[in-house]
């Protein structure tokens, strides 16, 4: 294949951003890894850009994954607004203190509950769950080892990992726990 260097470049991008997502000790590093994995996924699905199906698959994958970003980004912003930090250990320490922070948008929402639900939306979008799975079968248009890598090791587990990483925050709002268990 004459495109092996490009393939290795895209694969290197993916393998650079996944450890960044996993080893990040703050929300910004997690978000950069999250976005990088999404970009690498798009590039790898779109690897054979001359094929119409690969083009359609990549074009479908990108907006569906952006849904997850529209949950994660406000969730991170909300955590920063509420806790004045992006560091996970500090957020978890401050979350244990009783908080009566409410957001009023024609209804009263507990701030931590809203943040957790936004994080869940991010995880659902990235992990191809509950309606956001439409791009996943089409991702097989990418090169075979990449298709397996994107599904098993990165995209699906990224959302699950983020929920697990933020689980100390999810302990406090009972409404968010109910939403997660029913999702």
From Swiss-Prot:
Membrane-crossing residue ranges in chain numbering: 7-27, 30-50, 111-131, 144-164
InterPro entries membership: ND/Mrp_TM, NU5C-like
The EC number(s) this enzyme carries: 7.1.1.2
Highest taxon in the source lineage: Eukaryota
Membrane-related topology note: Multi-pass membrane protein
Keywords tagged on the record: Electron transport, Membrane, Mitochondrion, Mitochondrion inner membrane, NAD, Respiratory chain, Translocase, Transmembrane, Transmembrane helix, Transport, Ubiquinone
GO BP terms: ATP synthesis coupled electron transport; electron transport coupled proton transport
Localisation per UniProt entry: Mitochondrion inner membrane
Enzyme class: translocase
The keyword Translocase appears for this protein: yes
Primary site of residence: mitochondrion
Reactions catalysed according to its record: a ubiquinone + NADH + 5 H(+)(in) = a ubiquinol + NAD(+) + 4 H(+)(out)
GO cellular component: mitochondrial inner membrane; plastid
Pfam families assigned: Proton_antipo_M
Any one Gene Ontology molecular-function term assigned to this protein's record: NADH dehydrogenase (ubiquinone) activity
Function field: Core subunit of the mitochondrial membrane respiratory chain NADH dehydrogenase (Complex I) that is believed to belong to the minimal assembly required for catalysis. Complex I functions in the transfer of electrons from NADH to the respiratory chain. The immediate electron acceptor for the enzyme is believed to be ubiquinone.
Family: Belongs to the complex I subunit 5 family.
Record-given protein name: NADH-ubiquinone oxidoreductase chain 5
Name of the gene: NDH5
């Amino acid at each position: 294949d004459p495109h092996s260097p490009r393939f290795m470049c895209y694969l290197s991008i993916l393998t650079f951003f996944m450890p960044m997502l996993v080893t990040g000790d703050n929300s910004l590093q997690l978000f950069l890894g999250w976005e990088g994995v999404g970009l690498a996924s798009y590039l790898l699905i779109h690897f054979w850009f001359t094929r119409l199906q690969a083009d359609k698959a990549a074009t479908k994958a990108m907006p569906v994954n952006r849904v997850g970003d529209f949950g994660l980004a406000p969730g991170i912003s909300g955590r920063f607004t509420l806790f004045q930090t992006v560091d996970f250990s500090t957020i978890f320490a401050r979350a244990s203190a009783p908080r009566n922070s409410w957001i009023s948008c024609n209804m009263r929402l507990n701030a931590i509950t809203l943040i957790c639900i936004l994080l869940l939306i991010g995880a659902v979008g990235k992990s191809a769950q509950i309606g956001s799975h439409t791009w996943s079968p089409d991702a097989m248009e990418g090169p075979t080892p990449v298709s397996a890598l994107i599904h098993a090791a990165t995209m699906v587990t990224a959302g699950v990992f983020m929920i697990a990483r933020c689980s100390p925050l999810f302990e406090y709002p009972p409404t968010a726990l109910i939403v997660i268990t029913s999702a």
